[in-house]
A protein has these predicted regions:
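Active-site acidic/histidine proton-transfer and metal-coordination neighborhood
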Residues: 17, 58, 73-185
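Residue-level preference for long, well-ordered alpha-helices that form the structural scaffold
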Residues: 41, 45-48, 92-99, 131-134, ...
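Conserved beta-strand positions in the central sheet of alpha/beta enzyme cores
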Residues: 31, 65-67, 119, 212-215, ...
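Glycine-rich, proline-tolerant flexible connector loops at the mouths of alpha/beta enzymes
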Residues: 33-56, 122-129
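Histidine-acidic metal/acid-base catalytic patches
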Residues: 1-4, 11-26, 37, 50-53, ...
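Hydrophobic residues in well-ordered beta-strands that form the structural core
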Residues: 32, 63-65, 158, 188, ...
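Active-site loop/turn elements of alpha/beta-hydrolase fold enzymes
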Residues: 34-35, 68-71, 122-123, 161, ...
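Short, solvent-exposed beta-strand-terminating loops
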Residues: 64-76
Length: 283
């Protein structure tokens, strides 16, 4: 396994600048935020793509994931909070189609930068769109997306999160089975699993063949706030032993969007804390 860092901590930097900072610290991979102010809209023919490719080559970085979990760029004013609209489960067909088009663009971008996978979320159940209705909208959206992903040979990982339509590993596994695509899986955030007190060995065993990327951060007292590894309560020795047991071979991507005030420090502390786990052959 290899260690990556997400550019969503570097929202005061351009995407090429963020990749450079991550590369200079010694990470093997980088996750690209497909939202403002980075890869949005995620058009693979955009002028910035060549700059990104040059930075990846310069620092020998792979792309661990194209992160399409949020799409605040669709809205003219930032609220300062993550947004999941337009979502794939929205009651309005036109809104869903916006997100479907965006997701297909993520897939095209992944091809261009040699990423194996993208990540998305289910979205929330808004007023007038209860879960039993929203899930059908989500399934139909995913069927169209997965047809496109299969033709482009890109994996699609759904990231579940407390408060979303799909908010735990059991629900995600059921959704994967219903949609029926071999390229649909998980962008598994182990911090989220800690927040909702999931049994980690059971979770990893359930999803192991469908985990395309792992998000990692520390969590304190099961509160959903991403912390630098070592700053919370997660037992990383135990956690990495669980990951080792399923023979996971993908990226561990540190996700610390909560540190946009000092992303370089967050990335530096993270790699210093986590590197011994890799050097000691735990992973």
């Amino acid at each position: 396994m290899k260690l990556a860092f997400s550019t969503n901590a570097f929202t005061t930097y351009t995407l090429p600048e963020a990749i450079s900072e991550i590369g200079k610290l010694g990470y093997k991979g980088v996750e690209i935020l497909a939202d403002v102010p980075h890869a949005f809209p995620p058009v693979h023919t955009a002028a910035w793509v060549s700059d990104v490719q040059q930075k990846l080559e310069k620092y020998g970085l792979e792309v661990s994931n194209i992160n399409g979990n949020t799409a605040a760029g669709f809205f003219p004013y930032s609220t300062g909070e993550p947004t999941f609209e337009p979502s794939l489960c929205n009651a309005r067909e036109g809104v869903r189609n916006q997100r479907i088009k965006y997701t297909k663009q993520l897939i095209d971008l992944a091809v261009i930068v040699n990423a194996k996978n993208i990540s998305i979320t289910s979205g929330k159940c808004l007023s007038g769109n209860p879960p039993d209705q929203a899930i059908n909208h989500l399934i139909n959206s995913l069927i169209e997306i997965m047809d496109y992903a299969e033709r482009r040979e890109i994996n699609v990982g759904i990231e579940y999160e407390p408060g979303l339509l799909i908010e735990n590993g059991k629900e995600l596994n059921e959704l994967i089975q219903i949609v029926g695509s071999n390229r649909l899986g998980a962008n598994l955030d182990l911090g989220h699993a800690d927040v909702i007190r999931e049994d980690i060995p059971t979770l990893l065993s359930r999803l192991k063949s469908r985990i395309w990327n792992i998000h990692l951060e520390d969590i304190a007292d099961h509160k959903h706030y991403h912390l630098i590894p070592g700053h919370g309560n997660i037992d990383f020795n135990q956690l990495f032993n669980y990951v080792k047991q399923i023979k996971y071979k993908g990226f561990i991507t540190v996700e610390l969007y909560t540190y946009c005030n000092d992303p370089v420090l967050a990335a530096k502390e993270s790699i210093e804390f986590l590197t011994p786990y890799f050097k000691n052959s735990l992973l």
